[in-house]
Amino acid sequence: MPNWIDRLRRWALSALAVLAVAGCARTEPGTTTVRFWAMGREAEVVSELIHEFEAENPGIKVDVQNIPWTAAHEKLLTAFAADGLPDVCQLGNTWVPEFAELDALTPLQPFVQRSTVVDPKDYFRGIWDTNVIHGELVGVPWYVDTRLIYYRKDLLAKAGYDHPPRTWQEWDEQMAAIKRMQGPNRYAVLMPINEFEQQLSLALQQPDPLLRDDDTRGNFASPGFRRTLAFYANMFEQGWAPKMSETQISNVWDEFFRGFNVFYISGPWNIREFKKLQPKELEGQWGTAALPGPDGPGAGIAGGTSLVIFRKSQQKEASWKLIEFLSRPEIQARFHSIIGDLPPRRSTWNAPSLANDPLAAAFRDQLERVKPTPKVLEWERIVQEMRIVTEKVVRGGLAQDKAVEELDQRVDKVLAKRRWMHEQQRLQQRVPSPQSSSAVAAGSAQ
């Protein structure tokens, strides 16, 4: 086991007692307890559904622990090092590769093969793929998110357009027209430069991968990312987007409704926020649309969370029953009606609350084209490097050619350990085993 994991284990042993106490539940004789860690609002909502699961399965009790998102990653690593992980856990899709590389996740394909509930073909392809690491299924999607366009229908019509953009060229044309209409103190699009999701969404629409050489080096100097950066930076160069971070914007919902910007890229959670905060006179005057792509509606981020069973769980069968329960289309539909999270299964979208919602329809369309990000444990550090460098282009005037070179250098440093490990594995594969060496020597002697 790598030395850093040994150090992590030693550092975390002091937390073991705390985790053990927090995770223990008083269990009646003959009852199995499944420890389930969930995050934020989802943890609160799922507790309402757990009672139904326990009624269906009287021999199983579920101990739900609510982990704040801000502390979740550190707590999971601490628990891994201290052998204190739960049975079932909600994992962000970008965290799945990390815990898979730690060999902490149970392979789920055997469970899926005999399941009458979890049907891989019913899941959006890009979302399902986020849970397949090195060809092995290690999670089941729970809810999904992706980023697309929220837009003001009335202002777009005033600028002369009766439909949202479908291609990058159409988007450029519409933003230019909107800016001419808006004047100097209002804008076509709001793209907070302290975020990375916009750049990442656009980059996933390109054919070039973001990493190369078996995910050991950055590929940001590729033609695809250069096109992405040029398109993104041009929004600011033309004055279509303000050079502002989210902290400089008092309230994104208020600004949207007062016409500060016409387009805004965000996720499904904002459907409820915009509905709640919309002025009465603007009801029906805003909508959602799939992200434009280079040649038509484009790809987007395969975000959301998945349900996993940790490898050291002693309650794998009961844990799988819980995952199956939460994966039922009717349960997912109820989960959506309570919290607004979007379901990962196509069949769930037939529920009236989703099928009859025109604001959700664009997300349904976009989910057919989502793509997973590179499946490396360093990914969250890599996207922060991307954010830093693209902000330097927008704010500091860093030349785009220099920016992609700098970004590749930064990412190569982040991936240095992965590159070394990959090289060691390659060398080991080339070294003949003692038996094969003896056979070669014997053959030569003859």
Set out the residue ranges of the language-model regions.
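Short, low-complexity disordered leader/linker segments with a strong preference
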Residues: 1-35, 55, 357, 412, ...
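Short, well-ordered beta-strand elements
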Residues: 30-41, 60-65, 87-88, 187, ...
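Short, polar/charged alpha-helical segment
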Residues: 41-61, 386, 404
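Extracytoplasmic "Venus flytrap"/periplasmic binding protein-like
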Residues: 51-123, 132, 157-159, 163-166, ...
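Hinge/lid segment of periplasmic solute-binding proteins
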Residues: 93-146, 172, 200, 205-206, ...
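C-terminal lobe and pocket-closing loops
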Residues: 113, 268-283, 293-388, 422-433, ...
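Extracytoplasmic/periplasmic solute-binding protein
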Residues: 133-142, 147, 172-218, 261
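Glycine-centered hinge/linker elements that transmit conformational signals in sensory
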Residues: 175-177, 214-245, 291
